[in-house]
Amino acid sequence: MQTWQLPEHIADVLPTNARQLESAREQLLALFRVHGYELVQPPLMEYAHSLLTHIDAGLSLKTILVTDRLSGRQLGIRADITPQVARIDAHLLSANQGINRLCYAGPVLHAQPDGLLNMREPLQAGAEMYGFADIRGDIELIDLMLKSMKIADMGKVLLSLGHIGIFRALSDAAHLDAGQSATLLALMQDKDTGAVEAQVKAWKLDGMWAKAFSLLPRLYGGREVLSDARGRLPDLSAVGGALGELQAVCDAFPDCEIHIDLSELRVDNYHTGLLYAAYAADFHDAVARGGRYDGLGGYFGRARPATGFSFDLRSFIGRLPAIERQPAVLVDAEDAEAAREAVEALREQGQCVVIDYGIGHNVSEELAGRLKKTDGVWQVVKR
């Protein structure tokens, strides 16, 4: 193996893209800030039992574990920042009984990629709201998610909606146990209608519930899906409430193209209600995903309503505007000491000044000039 090789699905970010990413990160955090979201920076690594909540068993497959040489305890390198933010809200910010609006932008590390085209070191950015159960909170986060997409040239963005509350209401009414629910969840995630029908038949479910479960994978499309679902799904209060929340989101974004999929349920995840995602042309998967995950903080001692979204900012590379490098001022190496005061004055003004050692450099081809002493004064002389 060559010493310069990197692990699979791991890559360097070189200067041109690094400038784009840092600029996008700054714009994103500024956007979050003006909407009231405070920046938090959880550690990259912490005790594994804090990262691997019982709510999301699938997270353990993504988390890289190591032994702490100081304590001998097992540490985990974070694969998702949301559980860390839930811990912060539940423990470190517990004095606030009202709403906590929090945001972040930092690297995570995956033991295995989410897909063949995914990286194992995403730059996860997101915003989360804790302490507000109303659908208006979800609408606020969806609005912020869609605004976040505008920092890159995404073109037309499709908003995809789902609601795991419908499936759970049907599961409870049909008296499915945890194993049966997990089996149906997996089948629905695969959109395997035939397998769903065969499974509920094998369980000999009551006809009404068997029909409802078989119907869910077929309930997808535009806004009209909601009226179709109201007329065909069992009349349960929880189902009606979930459909009402989906309708409220549709009404809040009248000009947005919306796709609804009532079998989009996200297996092995911590979401509990409304699910939302943003899709853009030429992306093989959702650009951003979010949803409601009430109770996640209960693992850390304070269960609260919560909703939020996140995405991999590195996936935006190729859609971000070019960030030109500032033209540099050169100063000859032999003049550097004598011109130190002038050089530092220029740098304090934000001007890039590079010492020219006469062997080439990686600064911009377009130079702002060269620092020369003219009539006893150091001045930038244009070429």
Curated annotation (Swiss-Prot):
Pathway it works in: Amino-acid biosynthesis; L-histidine biosynthesis; L-histidine from 5-phospho-alpha-D-ribose 1-diphosphate: step 1/9
Keyword Ligase (UniProt): no
GO cellular component: cytoplasm
Protein's GO biological process: histidyl-tRNA aminoacylation; L-histidine biosynthetic process
Entry-linked InterPro entries: aa-tRNA-synth_II/BPL/LPL, HisRS-like_core, HisRS/HisZ, HisZ
Gene Ontology MF terms: histidine-tRNA ligase activity
Keywords noted in UniProt: Amino-acid biosynthesis, Cytoplasm, Histidine biosynthesis
Protein localization: Cytoplasm
Miscellaneous field: This function is generally fulfilled by the C-terminal part of HisG, which is missing in some bacteria such as this one.
Protein purpose: Required for the first step of histidine biosynthesis. May allow the feedback regulation of ATP phosphoribosyltransferase activity by histidine.
Assembly mode: Heteromultimer composed of HisG and HisZ subunits.
UniProt family annotation: Belongs to the class-II aminoacyl-tRNA synthetase family. HisZ subfamily.
Protein name: ATP phosphoribosyltransferase regulatory subunit
Originating species: Neisseria meningitidis serogroup C (strain 053442)
Gene: hisZ
